[in-house]
Amino acid sequence: MRLLIVEDEKQICDAVAKSLYDAGYEVDTCYDGEEALEYILTENYDLIVLDLNLPGMDGMEILKELRQSNEETKVLILSARGQIADKVEGLD
């Protein structure tokens, strides 16, 4: 299973990636929105772990782009945002 971890906090990103790699997953990482979109549009992932608070293009923008180009890829949102509106927007 191929995963992409998108998180701007390098320590968090690397810790999540290492745990998943150690569990046997193939893992790519990136730390900003533009780089993430480039990976998403050129590679095939089974799951994307996506932070919402990213520099440049934020996670919601990436999610909208992903849904326009590939409805099949599953996304797990990883964020400190706690607002209900953010959760609902992520489901759309």
Short names for language-model regions:
Residues 1-92:
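N-terminal/domain-start alpha-helical segments
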